Amino acid sequence: MRLLKVATCNLNQWAMDFESNMKNIKASIAEAKAAGAVIRLGPELEVTGYGCEDHFLELDTVTHAWECLKELLLGDWTDDILCSIGMPVIKGAERYNCQVLCMNRRIIMIRPKMWLANDGNYRELRWFTAWKQREELEEFQLPIEISEALEQKSVPFGYGYIQFIDTAVAAEVCEELFSPLPPHAELALNGVEVFMNASGSHHQLRKLDIRLNAFMGATHARGGVYMYSNQQGCDGSRLYYDGCACIVVNGNVVAQGSQFSLRDVEVIISQVDLDAVASLRGSISSFQEQASCKVKVSSVAVPCRLTQSFNLKMTLSSPKKIIYHSPQEEIAFGPACWMWDYLRRSGASGFLLPLSGGADSSSVAAIVGCMCQLVVKEIAKGDEQVKADANRIGNYANGQFPTDSKEFAKRIFYTVFMGSENSSEETKRRSKQLADEIGAWHLDVCIDGVVSAVLSLFQTVTGKRPRYKVDGGSNAENLGLQNIQARMRMVLAFMLASLLPWVHSKPGFYLVLGSSNVDEGLRGYLTKYDCSSADINPIGSISKMDLRLFLKWAATNLGYPSLAEIEAAPPTAELEPIRSDYSQLDEVDMGMTYEELSVYGRMRKIFRCGPVSMFKNLCYKWGTKLSPAEVAEKVKYFFKYYSINRHKMTVLTPSYHAESYSPEDNRFDLRQFLYNSKWPYQFKKIDEIVDSLNGDSVAFPEEEANSNKEIGVVAANSGDPSAGL
């Protein structure tokens, strides 16, 4: 047997905070060494933090990374352990995203990333160059300060692996695993048995299985030990890096770290037998044949042994059941951990939420409640960093600290019901009930006086006073009156957030939380600069459909039973007067359902459908219930209002990224914000197709016509009804 103990980790790094990042790196190495591990893998760009963005273009960022690495190598941190450290490196005129492989106070080699992530939220090609020289390793001259301190002038640089006496180890960096021809396939044929994947991978609902399947698939047919490390937490932007460090052996997960956690450092250890890798490879004929004619990959020889022989005191790690969270748990824990990092790192003393008693703001309140529960649980487990942060934020003194989530919420969470003459007693009651269940400090504010003052000023200036639609007013008057209420709520929210701590003799300031969902952003069903305008928004990238399922789950699992009643209530903005024959409803106002909006959103973003492609595909999805002409009207109606309201996305509050069809304007969904909302060419093409059908409908087999399967598209213009979403 060749027994090998390896360690990987989740680290809660913060972009550009070299001091705290180094503290976490050192803690993870110390824990790995204490457990007897001889390999330690850290996350991608762990020294600087993955999310530095344009700070990567600054020479200071690279210089400081080298200074931090020098500090590690001058100490005993790398003694008797191979450490993979992620940091940017400049070679010549190019900047590379690198894993620096160190051992015994020396740099063994530097492995630059070859395939960069450049889609979705990723933009690595803006800051880094992909390494394309695969033939052989080059010599890299270390910076003068580093070479003098380490007494090491140069190191191998490029694509290759480390050949120890008893095994071979190589790095594979994040996106490379998901490329069409991943490096681990070629490296395995060259005899590499241990793969180290340093990653900066962010959370997205229902995404984890894709990642884990890739790890397992990498070693299922080729054999090997696959180590994965990731950041965990908010490192300064809309993304939450969701950890889940893991170790996979021959396709089986033998260790898995948490996906959501408040901890700064989490190290997982595994004891593996490399002979099991050799045995599997020797049993696969095709592997043997391909290995015999492999393309040779360069290596660096290290005269050192990593493994131990048969030893009954060393227990092998066994395959474990993979832990997956439900989407409802992901909505609870991901944004809760993200908000905790934002709160403790911003210097704020708490949150303020305009709580209307509706589904969206109640979801945000529940997530804050979940955050408070997680804080108390982590303190009970003995996490001193969480305890110190909670004591500062909650203004605890005399040895006290949070032991009850409701008591902690009372210290850090204000909720405000900003009612008007258009608000119902039901939403007012539900708002107060939920706040009490969470433990928030709740206020009930009537905004009628403020709205009336604004209207009086308008009447003084113009000589006219607008009326609601139900009172005979025009659409322009009706919309203007609704927007006044919404915008006054934003002004009051920020005023209360800045002054309530002063009123209650508390230090600091409060962050205002927004509560618009992804579907409302897509449709533009929100007032520009209303309560959707806040400091941060934990649900801005989550669909209404998912939020309603979350509310049902949270009513029981978070202990907030009023959420069940809130979920069952029809969504309403309560910005128009309630009459016996009229009550404002969101879906009526929008002219489409939230379920339809989810479909439009997925087709527009995930499957890259323009108006014509969306129409064609929806003819298949909705063909049993709607005629092509009816589908055409729905598609045109959506694109009309999407384009009219697109400008609102440019100023929307920074939101937690959770959904693959988010219309978030900062990076994920880059589009113009001035459209011809009539879409004359595209809508004309749709009309021509409808006319050419002569009233025909889509022909479905009987079993498909009666089924309720998902949308039948794989890409724009696919037109394939058998392809499921």
From Swiss-Prot:
Q: Which residues form the CN hydrolase domain?
A: 4-274
The residues the record assigns to binding ATP are P354, L355, S356, G357, G358, A359, D360, S361
Enzymatic reactions = deamido-NAD(+) + L-glutamine + ATP + H2O = L-glutamate + AMP + diphosphate + NAD(+) + H(+)
Which pathway is it part of? Cofactor biosynthesis; NAD(+) biosynthesis; NAD(+) from deamido-NAD(+) (L-Gln route): step 1/1
Family listed: In the C-terminal section; belongs to the NAD synthetase family.
- GO cellular component terms, A-Z: cytoplasm
Superkingdom of this entry's organism? Answer: Eukaryota
Q: What is this protein called?
A: Glutamine-dependent NAD(+) synthetase
Organism source for this protein?
A: Arabidopsis thaliana
Q: What is its EC number?
A: 6.3.5.1
The UniProt entry annotates the active site at E44 (proton acceptor), K113 (for glutaminase activity), C174 (nucleophile), S356
Record carries keyword NAD? yes
Q: Where is this region: Ligase?
A: 324-709
InterPro entries in alphabetical order: C-N_Hydrolase, C-N_Hydrolase_sf, Gln-dep_NAD_synthase, NAD/GMP_synthase, NAD_synthase, Rossmann-like_a/b/a_fold
Name the Pfam families for this protein: CN_hydrolase, NAD_synthase
One MF annotation (Gene Ontology) recorded for this entry: glutaminase activity
Give an example GO biological process.
Answer: NAD biosynthetic process
